[in-house]
């Protein structure tokens, strides 16, 4: 049976048994920005299992895209060297949310594998948790598995938990005996040894979530037990197609054939070089699906894992004699073979191929120098690669640490990882020092919590979302040379965050005025800094009554910040959903937006982006701001930055039908208040990162007038018409 048929038969079977077939969720988890990638079928249902979300059905079935590379679940190191490890795979699963439990789940699994799939029941083993008498009895009495093929195992193999606390429970696994010669009953130890050796293959895991583990480790029965099952599609295909490796199934054969065509050597699994073929085939699938789901190669987070996968593939192609882009052609084969099941691969083909080729070319430009340096470092029979040298391979030649470790292991070497981390931290320290030097206020301790004279115990309240002018009191002050810092009880001044610059303005007291030139964070509060005109009280003991006024330029900043959200949405619409923010500057006089993209925008793309933003402005959409639970906001489609630390409750800036982002900045009440938007430049700032600068409102109008004046002047000199 072909892989596509195995997938469809699974979904059809469970649909016939009352399950709602749901689409795979994205590889980028919607409800959990701290999780690198979707790595199991249950990820999209996590909040359903926790009772926090209702999806309108209590039975579901899916074929879920999964990636295990980076983080807790990381199969990257094993890919190509074993018969079953993959970075990208599909997980078939059926789920019960408080509906059926062990009896039906076990019966469904048995009927599908022995009936519709036609697997030999005499070759099937079942395992249960040593404490799960109920499951053991169901396998033995209800299904009829003999005791010699039913094993009780411990927590490591047969107990599952979502986290240290919360829903958990025993699991039961189905295994298939792939041996040609079977010699009789097995002991538990023999079974485990054969399973670890790949001769007996796990094909399905049934998790019975029946307990809630508290923070003391105690288990309490759940009021509505659930079922979460997972069967690796590729592993199941290997069993049903009678092959000894997932790479020899019909879903990988076209990819291995493409690699063989590119390197001009047939694939021979007996040769050591065959590892490279398998790595290229696997990594091409991971790259294609990650790019299609909006992940973009970068230097951190998900993007860095993708870059590591790409560069591992380039290195294997290089060892196979390919010194030109190779993975891009295998990605193209992935699109051809899997595009029917996943149409996004086809619609985003150009982006997938362009990005893959660009990343390959970038690493190929430095790989030779890096390989030569590595050869010098690992010229003996064994030894250690110094940490500072591993860092140079990373920083100068683009070799991820795990790639250097892999190369070292192949030579019998180790890498001084601690030394690498020290060199990396030193670079970060220098970067922080450079940033501090460029911010003299911070360098002088403007963010230091010491030295403040506290006049009021009342905590500060930020009122800057609603008010630009407020009468309030000074709750603390600090004199630092010729500068004075004030912490106001009610503070209208925005402190630089999320790309938006700090406010300026003034604070007036009885006979004195402070001109605000800098705003900083001091603990959880905000301080305004500046020079004082007049006589600031020498030794106040009670809160000083003042009037704080934010400069009118805040209105321009507000326009630019809302325009930045419109720009982000327009770039994603025109260039693709791989576009994500890499940095921004929101100032009164301009806005700057850095984003992930491979190459320069065409003039047509720039014009289209401008048009989309201006149409949104002229439509005068309301800008809605509310606070929600983080998971609810992300589930509703709000854009969140991976790696950003968000609280349980987040601030959502929503322009209905146009944009929804998590954002703490200040915004216009409606898009119409922006007035006008104009792109003024577009350039590259780093590998795979583009930058656009733009103007809004009066600034955009004045820019256009200046351009027209310059054009008219040039036409006059040339005695022609513009």
Ranges and model annotations:
Residues 1-722:
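A glycine- and charged-residue-rich anion-binding loop/surface
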